[in-house]
Amino acid sequence: MSFCSFFGGEVFQNHFEPGVYVCAKCGYELFSSRSKYAHSSPWPAFTETIHADSVAKRPEHNRAEALKVSCGKCGNGLGHEFLNDGPKPGQSRFUIFSSSLKFVPKGKETSASQGH
């Protein structure tokens, strides 16, 4: 079992359609489907955010290799970033709760990020 507590219902774990994952609370763009990859944890995994300010990060208590991440716009809790745990050396793994995400299919990104 991974570091995060598993609550189930991770609808985006095996979801690989082209598009953008936005904050479920405010619609801010967080992750591109291009940065998503299959991982053994039960949560969706991403290697990088869309924008430098897509997420805010703060240290996880007693876990130097883990950071808590939240939406960079509204502060909605998203999950964790695990440093140097991505698919390639030096990459991070963002372990994100499906309930904190909304998926916007390719071609619909602009209207979703503007809250339409």
Swiss-Prot record:
The MsrB domain, residue ranges: 1-106
InterPro entries: Met_Sox_Rdtase_MsrB_dom (IPR002579), MsrB_Met_sulfoxide_reductase (IPR052150), Mss4-like_sf (IPR011057)
Physiological role: Methionine-sulfoxide reductase that specifically reduces methionine (R)-sulfoxide back to methionine. While in many cases, methionine oxidation is the result of random oxidation following oxidative stress, methionine oxidation is also a post-translational modification that takes place on specific residue. Acts as a regulator of actin assembly by reducing methionine (R)-sulfoxide mediated by MICALs (MICAL1, MICAL2 or MICAL3) on actin, thereby promoting filament repolymerization. Plays a role in innate immunity by reducing oxidized actin, leading to actin repolymerization in macrophages.
Family classification: Belongs to the MsrB Met sulfoxide reductase family.
Record note on modification: Truncated MSRB1/SEPX1 proteins produced by failed UGA/Sec decoding are ubiquitinated by the CRL2(FEM1C) E3 ubiquitin-protein ligase complex.
Catalytic activity from the UniProt record: L-methionyl-[protein] + [thioredoxin]-disulfide + H2O = L-methionyl-(R)-S-oxide-[protein] + [thioredoxin]-dithiol; [thioredoxin]-disulfide + L-methionine + H2O = L-methionine (R)-S-oxide + [thioredoxin]-dithiol
GO biological process: actin filament polymerization; innate immune response; protein repair
Residue spans crossing the bilayer: none
Keywords carried by this UniProt record: Cytoplasm, Cytoskeleton, Immunity, Innate immunity, Metal-binding, Nucleus, Oxidoreductase, Selenocysteine, Ubl conjugation, Zinc
UniProt organism field: Pongo abelii (Sumatran orangutan)
Top-level enzyme category: oxidoreductase
Sequence positions that bind Zn(2+): C23, C26, C71, C74
PROSITE patterns the record matches: MSRB (PS51790)
Subcellular location: Cytoplasm; Nucleus; Cytoplasm, Cytoskeleton
Record-given protein name: Methionine-R-sulfoxide reductase B1
One cellular component (GO) term of this entry: cytoskeleton
Cofactor-binding details, from the entry: Binds 1 zinc ion per subunit.
GO molecular function ontology, one term from the record: actin binding
Enzyme Commission identifier(s): 1.8.4.12, 1.8.4.14
